[in-house]
Amino acid sequence: MRLNELNREELSALYRSQMTRDFPPQELKPLKSMLELMEEGRYQALGLFDEEELLGYALVWREPGVPFALLDYLGTLPGVRNRGLGGQMLDLLADYYREERGIFGEAESDEGGDPTDRELRHRRLGFYLRNGFRYGGYDCALFGVHYQALIRGTADVSPEELLEVHRRFYQSRFPAHIYERFVQLPLAPGETPNPPGNWMEE
């Protein structure tokens, strides 16, 4: 298996056919936002292929001069799930970005939120923690959703360094009024996420 970069058309097709089914609306960036970042050279769509068959995908946000990669979305296609492909894809990503200090991301916290989804959130967190990620040292809230910061990288990455990098990604993308309203980095213990907003308000 290998990772191949997808182009704009392939990302657009993947978004419409799979991602809108795989992720709830409040967690999914607009396609327009992804394509703009890709046009700027700041977003990579990687497909997991077995020969010519697409099995999964990883969307990764990059910032110039920042030695970290933000894993924005990870998914496998229907029909090939529960085969360990997610863990294999994380290993391939770690090799793909081996020159960087780490890959980090956000996994929805199992605290708060809709109690009917709590078990799913708990399983997602466990998946990342079983596959080389560790807690980054802080929680955050993005557009009303409570996340935990996770990282797979060198052991010397401190929570302070990761938080600074994490802020840089979002501050570079959103105007100050959107950032202040919808991005809470970090989310202090006991603090409540701000009311959710529409990604399109950017």
Question: Would you name each region that the model predicts?
Answer:
Residues G47, E53-R62, F68-G75:
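Conserved beta-strand in the GNAT
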Residues Y97-L120:
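Conserved GNAT acetyl-CoA-binding A-motif
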